[in-house]
């Protein structure tokens, strides 16, 4: 199909230009597989680090489900889930966490503050904001960690379990 040829050309071009050392693509619905191809030094069993793509695959999808069910609203604020949040972070909304506009920076290492993953919320909320919420986007994993903890509270289960 022509659409899959476009995907093939794009992935091949990226490989040739050095954008990545290898790639794999598959398109299917249910048990039906319409397109499957690998590029570079990999095969269909090669594991790839999805890194930040997981934001789309996990918390964003769960948040969308909770939004659809009415269990979460884009206007819900950090204070709704963490009543002890510091004043400067209380009004950060779910939408701001999802769009990287909550003012939360991403320039510190958790290991400098704690070795316990359970302290994540306390560490994030205790760290100074880089700017006021609602400003320009600042790409940050920390906002998504906070969002993940909110979703865990709503869903009653860990996202990584």
Question: Where in the sequence are the language-model features?
Answer:
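Flexible glycine/proline-enriched surface loops and loop-helix/loop-strand junctions
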Residues: 43-45, 127-133, 144-145
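Short, basic/aromatic recognition patches
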Residues: 2-16
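Mid-domain, small-residue-enriched loop/turn segments at the edges of structured enzyme/sensor domains
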Residues: 93, 142-143
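Residues at or immediately flanking beta-strands
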Residues: 22-24, 47, 77, 136
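Short, charged, amphipathic alpha-helices and their helix-cap/turn boundaries
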Residues: 34-37, 111-132, 137, 157-161
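A short, well-structured edge-of-sheet supersecondary motif
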Residues: 12-43, 74, 99, 111-113
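Active-site helix/loop module of the DD-peptidase/beta-lactamase fold
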Residues: 44, 49-53, 66-109, 122, ...
């Amino acid at each position: 199909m022509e659409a899959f040829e476009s995907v093939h050309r794009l992935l091949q071009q990226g490989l040739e230009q050095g954008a990545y050392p290898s790639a794999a693509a598959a398109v299917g619905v249910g048990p039906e597989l319409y397109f499957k191809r690998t590029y570079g030094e990999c095969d269909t069993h090669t594991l790839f680090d999805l890194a930040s793509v997981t934001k789309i695959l996990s918390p964003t999808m769960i948040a969308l489900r909770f939004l659809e069910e009415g269990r979460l609203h884009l206007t819900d604020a950090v204070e709704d889930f963490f009543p002890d949040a510091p004043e400067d972070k209380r009004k950060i909304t779910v939408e701001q966490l999802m769009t990287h506009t909550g003012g939360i920076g991403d320039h510190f290492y958790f290991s400098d503050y704690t070795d316990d993953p359970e302290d994540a919320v306390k560490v994030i909320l205790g760290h100074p904001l880089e700017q006021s919420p609602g400003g320009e986007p600042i790409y940050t994993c920390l906002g998504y960690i906070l969002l993940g903890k909110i979703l865990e509270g709503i869903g009653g289960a860990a996202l990584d379990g």
